[in-house]
């Protein structure tokens, strides 16, 4: 009888504990290729060199994505925790009949959203009054002239929210500087 209660309590504790946690989701090679293609298309359009995939940056991005999914909250990491890395964030959630529907290409979806900020972007130095009322920082990080590497990662919260984090090296978005 005592063993049964111990097992039941242990199972309930484990279940409660796992509900509080997010989890890593490995991106497919196809999704990585598509996301990188979108980044490089944006860069080529403005006359920049392409950037390369970095497993190291992807691993760093995964740590932060896991943190966001565990807390079920989106916010940027501190500059101190990601020295010499830029960061783009994306959040997604959709459901049908109360069940989450996951994106088939989350890194591609995020990259397209960041790229589409070009619609509002007016070429100027970062932080210019020309762009102060629009969100363009994800796009400018994608096309920052000195950036050479990117890594992207995905984590899901227990309720199905998807958190996508991209890390860039060297970082961009320096006040008073042109992105390209």
Predicted feature residues:
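Short gly/Ser/Thr-rich phosphate-binding loop of adenylate-forming enzymes
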Residues: 89
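Intrinsically disordered, low-complexity regions enriched in Ser/Pro/Gly/Gln/His and often acidic
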Residues: 6-7, 46, 57, 106-108, ...
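Bacterial Sec-dependent signal peptides at the C-terminal "C-region" and cleavage site
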Residues: 11-26
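Short, well-ordered surface patches within globular domains
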Residues: 23, 27-86
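Sec-dependent N-terminal signal peptides
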Residues: 4-12
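Disulfide-stabilized extracellular recognition modules
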Residues: 93-180
